[in-house]
Design a protein with these regions (language model features):
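Charged, low-complexity intrinsically disordered regulatory/assembly segments
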Residues: 129-187
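Pre-recognition alpha-helix immediately N-terminal to the DNA-recognition helix
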Residues: 26-31
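Short coil turns linking two alpha-helices in DNA-binding domains
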Residues: 50-55
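Short, Lys/Arg-enriched N-terminal segment that forms or immediately precedes the first helix
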Residues: 2-18
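Glycine-centered, phosphate/nucleic-acid-interacting loop/turn motifs that mediate DNA/RNA or nucleotide
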Residues: 65
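A short acidic, leucine-rich amphipathic alpha-helix
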Residues: 42-48, 61
Length: 187
């Protein structure tokens, strides 16, 4: 049995950030958060994927210390490993500034924003056949002059939105939506 997991894991190594680059790995962590602990087969069912497509990614997340083995249980005649995320929340250490870390973080942001672009594009094209417009689609880009307190308040609101979305995520009983947000201090 794995020891009690911490509430927050602060990622501070480039290899950990690189492990998050693919949307599938982000989806795996989100599903693990929803399921608390799951076998590869259970994760595959939750994600609508073949189990074989997940093993490599779970191994990479485990090697980066973002996922850990919780227990091994019997499933018929086979032993089945049950995994869990390494912490309730995984956060990136924003104070880390080594070149390798910043490069890995840049790649992660590019991959995340590219995935968001693919999701919005797919949503737009899915509605181009004459159906009613998708009133849930929303895109906002703002630049503003903010105080440090304003930025902290905005981050707190985004944290609250992320918590709300995570708490209301239920596999199988609602439509799927994508949310992406970024706050960046402009040079």
């Amino acid at each position: 049995m794995a020891p009690r997991k911490p509430r927050i894991l602060h990622i501070s190594e480039p290899r950990q950030v690189r492990a998050l680059r693919t949307p599938l790995r982000q989806d795996i962590l989100q599903a693990m958060s929803l399921l608390e602990a799951a076998s590869v087969k259970e994760l595959a069912t939750a994600l609508g994927r073949a189990p074989a497509s997940l093993y490599y990614h779970i191994h990479e997340l485990e090697n980066a210390g973002l996922v850990r083995k919780r227990t091994v249980r019997r499933s018929g005649t086979k032993a089945e490993t049950v995994y869990e995320s390494a912490a309730e929340q995984i956060r990136i250490d924003r104070a880390k500034r080594t070149k390798g870390f910043v490069d890995a973080l840049t790649d992660l942001h590019k991959a995340t924003l590219s995935q968001a672009t693919r999701e919005v594009t797919a949503a737009l094209h899915a509605r181009s056949g004459g159906d009613a417009p998708d009133n849930s689609l929303m895109l906002v880009r703002l630049s503003a002059r903010l105080s440090g307190a304003d930025v902290k308040a905005a981050r707190r609101m985004l944290d609250e939105l992320a918590a709300f979305i995570s708490e209301h995520d239920r596999v199988g009983n609602r439509e799927a939506f994508s949310f992406t947000a970024a706050i960046a201090k402009l040079p």
